[in-house]
């Protein structure tokens, strides 16, 4: 950050830093942005532009501020569903399939890595059963996943040495579609930033299925539809 602001000062650039204290906090130590605002001040944006429906725009602000009574509004509009973990996972896969078949971009979210892995497996299995993916074609075996041509994946590490045909570096949490799995197990991916071929070393360590992700990983994405599974483990009360 110091290097960036130093360059900006040298060349007369303007640096605009944007943050939201009500979003998920950093996994590690955080608080730097709030500290900067405390010292130098900031401008607060007070209008929401991201939602299509006015009711959801207003409800999102109440939810952001911790107003639990707004859940009744979501429930009234059939946005909340409950059931067993298995029922919820089946339901979210069905909703995901309906949304994407309608041409919508959709994000599946869950609050645990285990649930995310199961959703990714179910989504891939659904696409195999529907004939969208060929399990007998080129494939890549990872530790706990198998990747096929056409699978949706995410990259999990920034690497400035790997760039798309548009010159954009490969970044953590970028979303891609597998175009080609080469004999040497390198993989060609296509995403919003272009096409790139990743070496086998990067693929085996830093590529995974991307149909579902944790809520933290999905934060900041703009999609047409979101569906989220929250798994709650109940334990008997101590006596």
Segments the model singles out, each with a brief description of its role:
Residues 1-239:
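Conserved ATP-binding/catalytic motifs of P-loop helicase motor domains
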